């Protein structure tokens, strides 16, 4: 029996050109030039980058290839500090931080279904800097078994950070599982979400 051995560089079908992350993490953000050819951005001097990108973009890249890069490389994808989702579970508390800066509390629905929290956001078409856009997302997270579901809370900060949190109960106590909606309250101050 023949076994094909691949170099670790090509773990995915298309190697470094195949996406290795979720695409919808930044809801409608812009695109930077280094997102089009990220593997070159660290190897080329900044003095030549601008002209190289202009040459490549102006030299007739097919529309399909351009679209592929737009879809696969969202802004800040490689920077873990800019990840729009942070889930923290320590000894006393379970917290989800989710960047939803394009949504208002009225656009968000947060529900607890058994051992899961479901966060859904949707806004109808509205005008922004680039034209008209509508956005929608749906996230589902498993709650730890010892989270007190009767004390769950959810708030949206002034800078668009949704914070879902619940205290953990000591082992042996009933955490109380049921289906219910969690209201999203609005805070006037920016989020204190961790940066890493």
Swiss-Prot record:
<dbReference type="GO" id="GO:0007017">
    <property type="term" value="P:microtubule-based process"/>
</dbReference>
<comment type="similarity">
    <text>Belongs to the small heat shock protein (HSP20) family.</text>
</comment>
<dbReference type="InterPro" id="IPR003090">
    <property type="entry name" value="Alpha-crystallin_N"/>
</dbReference>
<keyword id="KW-0862">Zinc</keyword>
<dbReference type="InterPro" id="IPR001436">
    <property type="entry name" value="Alpha-crystallin/sHSP_animal"/>
</dbReference>
<feature type="modified residue" description="Phosphoserine">
    <location>
        <position position="145"/>
    </location>
</feature>
<feature type="compositionally biased region" description="Basic and acidic residues">
    <location>
        <begin position="176"/>
        <end position="190"/>
    </location>
</feature>
<feature type="modified residue" description="Deamidated asparagine; partial">
    <location>
        <position position="124"/>
    </location>
</feature>
<feature type="modified residue" description="N6-acetyllysine">
    <location>
        <position position="122"/>
    </location>
</feature>
<dbReference type="GO" id="GO:0007005">
    <property type="term" value="P:mitochondrion organization"/>
</dbReference>
<dbReference type="GO" id="GO:0043010">
    <property type="term" value="P:camera-type eye development"/>
</dbReference>
<feature type="modified residue" description="Deamidated glutamine; partial">
    <location>
        <position position="170"/>
    </location>
</feature>
<dbReference type="GO" id="GO:0070141">
    <property type="term" value="P:response to UV-A"/>
</dbReference>
<dbReference type="GO" id="GO:0042542">
    <property type="term" value="P:response to hydrogen peroxide"/>
</dbReference>
<feature type="domain" description="sHSP">
    <location>
        <begin position="76"/>
        <end position="185"/>
    </location>
</feature>
<dbReference type="GO" id="GO:0050821">
    <property type="term" value="P:protein stabilization"/>
</dbReference>
<comment type="subunit">
    <text>Heteropolymer composed of three CRYAA and one CRYAB subunits. Inter-subunit bridging via zinc ions enhances stability, which is crucial as there is no protein turn over in the lens. Can also form homodimers and homotetramers (dimers of dimers) which serve as the building blocks of homooligomers. Within homooligomers, the zinc-binding motif is created from residues of 3 different molecules. His-123 and Glu-125 from one molecule are ligands of the zinc ion, and His-130 and His-177 residues from additional molecules complete the site with tetrahedral coordination geometry.</text>
</comment>
<dbReference type="GO" id="GO:0060561">
    <property type="term" value="P:apoptotic process involved in morphogenesis"/>
</dbReference>
<dbReference type="GO" id="GO:0032387">
    <property type="term" value="P:negative regulation of intracellular transport"/>
</dbReference>
<feature type="region of interest" description="Disordered">
    <location>
        <begin position="168"/>
        <end position="196"/>
    </location>
</feature>
<feature type="modified residue" description="N-acetylmethionine">
    <location>
        <position position="1"/>
    </location>
</feature>
<feature type="modified residue" description="Deamidated glutamine; partial">
    <location>
        <position position="50"/>
    </location>
</feature>
<dbReference type="Pfam" id="PF00525">
    <property type="entry name" value="Crystallin"/>
</dbReference>
<feature type="modified residue" description="Deamidated asparagine; partial">
    <location>
        <position position="146"/>
    </location>
</feature>
<dbReference type="GO" id="GO:0043066">
    <property type="term" value="P:negative regulation of apoptotic process"/>
</dbReference>
<keyword id="KW-0007">Acetylation</keyword>
<feature type="binding site">
    <location>
        <position position="125"/>
    </location>
    <ligand>
        <name>Zn(2+) 1</name>
    </ligand>
</feature>
<dbReference type="GO" id="GO:0007021">
    <property type="term" value="P:tubulin complex assembly"/>
</dbReference>
<keyword id="KW-0325">Glycoprotein</keyword>
<dbReference type="GO" id="GO:0048596">
    <property type="term" value="P:embryonic camera-type eye morphogenesis"/>
</dbReference>
<feature type="modified residue" description="N6-acetyllysine">
    <location>
        <position position="93"/>
    </location>
</feature>
<feature type="binding site">
    <location>
        <position position="130"/>
    </location>
    <ligand>
        <name>Zn(2+) 2</name>
    </ligand>
</feature>
<dbReference type="GO" id="GO:0001666">
    <property type="term" value="P:response to hypoxia"/>
</dbReference>
<keyword id="KW-0488">Methylation</keyword>
<dbReference type="GO" id="GO:0005654">
    <property type="term" value="C:nucleoplasm"/>
</dbReference>
<dbReference type="GO" id="GO:0002088">
    <property type="term" value="P:lens development in camera-type eye"/>
</dbReference>
<dbReference type="GO" id="GO:0005829">
    <property type="term" value="C:cytosol"/>
</dbReference>
<dbReference type="GO" id="GO:0051082">
    <property type="term" value="F:unfolded protein binding"/>
</dbReference>
<dbReference type="GO" id="GO:0002089">
    <property type="term" value="P:lens morphogenesis in camera-type eye"/>
</dbReference>
<feature type="modified residue" description="Deamidated glutamine; partial">
    <location>
        <position position="6"/>
    </location>
</feature>
<keyword id="KW-0143">Chaperone</keyword>
<feature type="binding site">
    <location>
        <position position="123"/>
    </location>
    <ligand>
        <name>Zn(2+) 1</name>
    </ligand>
</feature>
């Amino acid at each position: 029996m023949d076994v094909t051995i691949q170099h670790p560089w090509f773990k995915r079908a298309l190697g470094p050109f195949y996406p290795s992350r979720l695409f919808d993490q930044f809801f409608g953000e812009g695109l930077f030039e280094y997102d089009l050819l990220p593997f070159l951005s660290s190897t080329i001097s900044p003095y030549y980058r601008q002209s190289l990108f202009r040459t490549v973009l102006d030299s007739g890249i097919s529309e399909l290839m351009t679209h592929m890069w737009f879809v696969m490389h969202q802004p800040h994808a490689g920077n873990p500090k800019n990840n729009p989702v942070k889930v923290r579970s320590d000894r006393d508390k379970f917290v989800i931080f989710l960047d939803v800066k394009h949504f208002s509390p009225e656009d968000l629905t947060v529900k607890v279904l058994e051992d899961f929290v479901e966060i859904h956001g949707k806004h109808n078409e509205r005008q922004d800097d680039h034209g008209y856009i509508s956005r929608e997302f749906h996230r589902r997270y498993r709650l730890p078994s010892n989270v007190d579901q009767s004390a769950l809370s959810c708030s949206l900060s002034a800078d668009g950070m949704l914070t879902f949190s619940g205290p953990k109960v000591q082992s042996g106590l009933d955490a109380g599982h049921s289906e219910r909606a969690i209201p999203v309250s609005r805070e006037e101050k920016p989020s204190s979400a961790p940066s890493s």
